[in-house]
Amino acid sequence: MEPRQKGALRGHKNPITCTIVFKDHKRNCNTLVTSDNEGWVAWWDISTKRPLGVWRAHSNSILSVVQIDHNLLLTHGKDSCVRIWAITQYEGFSKTFPAENHTESGSHRWPEYVEIPVNTLNFCNVCYLNGKLITPATQDSNNFDIYSIFPASAAHFPDIESRLSLRRIVANADPLALHKKAKSKENLTMGIDFEISDENSKRDGFGIMMKVVFVSPTLFYIGYESGHIIGFSLTEYKPNVNVKSKEGTTKAFDASFINKEPTLEIIYISAFHCPHPITALFFHDKLYAGSAGKTLSIHTKQSSIAEEPEIESYNLKIAGVQDIAVLPELAIVAFWNGVVKGYEKQSTEAESDQRELTTDFSTEPNTISQFKPAWKMSRDVPRIGTLESNNGQKEAQELPSKVKANTLCILKSSAITHSSYRDLVRARQVSPRLLTVGYADGVTIMYEI
């Protein structure tokens, strides 16, 4: 069934760059956070379609927005900083957007926040999970750093400045060097005692980071400019060890005394999308990847680089994947040309029938098809076409172009507690599942799916 529009969130005067679900634990409901390329952030009540708070989080475009705790929101901007905001005390927020071309934010109250300086020389996002933050490296945009920012021991502190304990646990990790190390280890396992030339060493590594996604506290994937997708395993040793003395007392010693630093290892690498830069990554049981090309790939997790990659590939017939969202029964892809398409996942029993029926979503040779085109949608840019000039001569009418869909986000409604009767009624009217699409004209539209 084609998505049905349920509402629009208007106010941003610039292209939307991020849309994420923010779980409001105070009211026990899901809300939405949007950002734009002028640094403005809006926190939305879905039932009323009105902002709970609006503020300018950065002086430049926002690249990443992530909820990292019950009341903390992380934003990452092109102004070379990551900021962490305590946003649940929203009663004092401004709830109005600035006028068009107005960037002064003095009248908009800022939430309490702390700041972390990071490298933003490229357009890669940052990624957070369980107290760890991955960012492009300070020294080299081709490499990456990993920070520990919220240790478990500080969880009881009342304010974010007290809880923040910034520690860089991995510095300037070089994927090319790690790949050579992994290949050498594999060669030794196979009994090969000489170095095999690496095609990646003939060029400037893998290029800059494009996308990064955490899968678990010990596993993450990075997509590169070269088109490679690399899976990294992170092993972090416990910071303290307990030693029992002869008298029976126990003392704790810092593990740094025995040089137990976190270790990184490459356990997966795919050159499937080369030479097209990776533009979208999404993990849902498997890793879904899109690039500047026309192909969607699905990668199965593996535990060693020695294993043969299991990749399913699909010809989307449209070049340039902007974003990907995946549900158990549906995959949604946004393209650079403004089209958003949905693909239903099919059971294996229906594969032969699907190959006969599918004309718009074919697979590459030797792959297994699991999808069927379900719907596609787009928004036209409003235009006034001139059919005749003043001298009466007919002129060619310009075809309308599409509004680019920048972001995709799946939002599931949840019950509101400790709220007014009016809010409870409004919450019942919200669809159980919404697809939110952030567009380049600053509008975020919600579709029932």
Curated annotation (Swiss-Prot):
It comes from the Eukaryota. Gene3D superfamilies: YVTN repeat-like/Quinoprotein amine dehydrogenase (2.130.10.10). GO terms for biological process: chromatin organization. The keyword Magnesium does not apply. WD repeats lie at residues 11-54, 57-95, 113-157, 224-263, 273-309, 313-350, 420-449. Keywords: Chromatin regulator, Nucleus, Repeat, WD repeat. It is found in: Nucleus. Coiled coil: none annotated. One of its GO terms (cellular component) is nucleus. Signal peptide: none annotated. Component of the ASTRA chromatin remodeling machinery complex. Component of the ASTRA complex involved in chromatin remodeling. Belongs to the WD repeat ASA1 family. This is ASTRA-associated protein 1. It comes from Meyerozyma guilliermondii (strain ATCC 6260 / CBS 566 / DSM 6381 / JCM 1539 / NBRC 10279 / NRRL Y-324) (Yeast).
